[in-house]
Every structure is written in C-alpha cells, then in structure tokens.
Amino acid sequence: MAKRYRAAAIGRTGSGNYGHGLHIAYAGIDKVDFIAVADPDGAGREQARQLTGATHAYADYREMLSTEAPDLVSVCPRWTDCHLEMVTACLEAGAHVYCEKPMTWNLADGDTIVNRADALGRKVAVAHQAVYLPRIQQLRVLLREGRIGQVQQIHAHGKQDRRGGGEDMITLGTHLFNMMRYFAGDVGWMSGHVTVDGRELEPGDVGEATEPVGPVAGDCVEAYYAFDSGVAGFFDSRRDQAGSSQRYGMEIVGSEGTISLRGGAGSELMIYPHPVFRPAAADQGWEPLEGLPDDPLATGNRLAIVDLIEAVEQDREPVSSARNAVAALEMILGAYEAQISGGRVAMPMARREHPLVAWRERQNT
C-alpha cells in the first residue's frame, strides 16, 4: 500500500502571514492528508484551519510538531527572521520542509539548514515556484536542444518599483537568480556595483527592508555573473523606474536568437529567431514562443509539494532545494561583497556572514 503523508503548515499572522499561499498547496494531492496548522494569532489560525480543512490548530508550532508528527510541513511566513528556527525544528521532528523564499537572510543560516537536513536525511524545498512550472521546465529543454543556438548571455531585471535596488534584489530577485542557475548552472565568480543617488555605497546607507529579510542597501544594483558553463549573466535594478510593473523578467541571448521572459511565471514568452537584433529589418520581428503550457505562478506551490514527495521517495534533491536557495542568495550578497571589496567575488563565497553586517561592524570598531 502506498505511503500516505501527513502534512501541516506553520504561519505567523501579522508577521509574514502564510507567505504566498504555501499552506493551501496540498489540496487534492494524492497521498497527502492535511492535518494541522500552527499560528500564534487566534483569528489567523482559525482562518487557516478553515482554508486548509485541517483537523487541528495550534498556537505553538513546536507543540504541533510534537503532537501530530507530520511528514511534510510548510514554513510559510514571508519574513526570514523565523525561518532558521522553524525549519530546523521541523527537520528535528522528522519532517520534510517546504519553505517560503528567501529561505534565510544570511549564508551561515542557510548552511545550517542544508547541513542539518543532510545529517537527518530530510529534504528541504524552497518556494521558487517558477522552476516547477511545466512552461519553464520545457523552456530549459528547448534551450538545451539549441532552439536559440548556444546560450551566451542572460539579462535579468528586477521589478524596479519603490523597492528597486537592494531590496528588490532580495525580495523578488531571488526568483530570478534561482531561474538563472536553473538555465545556466553554477556561478564561478561575480562582480557588482551598488550605488545610492549615483554615488558609491557608504556604511551609513545600510538599512532594513520594508519587511524583515535582512539588511539592504542601494537604490541601484548592477551585477555580472560568470557561469561555469560559459554563460554571462547580468542583473539590474533601479528604484522607482517608469513601467516598473513590466520590467521584471529576463532575456536569454543565444548565438542564433533571443528569448524574452516577462513576469515571474514567464506568461509573456517571446522569441526573436534571428542571430542579430535588427529592429529596422521588416522581415525580422518578435514571435510568440508557441506550444508551452501557461500555468499561473501559484500552481508552482502544488507542483513543488508533488516534487518534494518524489524527492523523498527517490532520494534526490528537490527541483528548488535548500542548496539552490543558498546559491541564489550568494548571487545577491555577492553584489554587496563585490562593491565593498572593489573586486571579483569567487563562488561559493568564503565568508558566510552577511557582507553589510560585517562592513558595519568593521566601521564601528
């Protein structure tokens, strides 16, 4: 008889809530019984219980873990200040975890989660939903089959709204960096330039983000990534740019064409099937990339849970694993490290503390 999985979710109403619906991703999944939610807020807890159909609800997530012994747990809050404690508690209780992004705000905490999961034989998946979508997975197949020739460059762009710069880079950029790695593999080294009002970054520019996702700095970030595969990667984000709602996405440039992916789920996917970009050429234009499914980004949560179960049963890494999350975070924090050091940053980064925290501490001693 096939194993059935007992699932639960941890939320924190008013302090990161339930993220982007990580608690409601289990509905209709074969082999899963959703049994419990935990939330210190009474009203939020009851609402989550009703939405998920959970039999039990707890104010204390540790009590839930001890009493219910779930096999799968969603760590839902958007805020990263609780992720290390919650994820490690789940792992130590014997559960596999689906965690909201960013998984951690610093590399040391991410390393702790990766190492603890390995030691306990547990899997951790992270809510970078796009890479679970059939549309994005099939796009990777097309790239590997040479649809645009040899992939040479990936240009990624943040949303560039009021959070543009450093906050955009951690809040939404984490999806882009994870996707860049999904297409191009590991980064060998990187460089970056972070500025405020056109001047070089100073220690006094370091502040907190709108939500607790670690320290941020800069209203303009431009970064370069040298992938081991030979692909050159670029990221840019500036604060309060015109058309910010349409900027988020990337262009994948190949030797024989270019693919434009706009939005988190790549719902606006176009191809320029020509080796040289010639806007004036009447016979050369952008075309829809046909034949790929178009699923909403939220579908990725359900697919991530299905993949997590398969990863457990096949003893493999999830598509978007804790290791992937740490590597994406390195691409973010490496921009600060490059700005502060004034040079290239080798990957993986040698120093695992947050570069902005370490910089401020050095300035204060």
Predicted features, each with a name:
Residues 175-270, 302-318, 333-335, 350-365:
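Contiguous beta-strand/loop segments that form the cofactor/metal-binding neighborhood of enzyme cores
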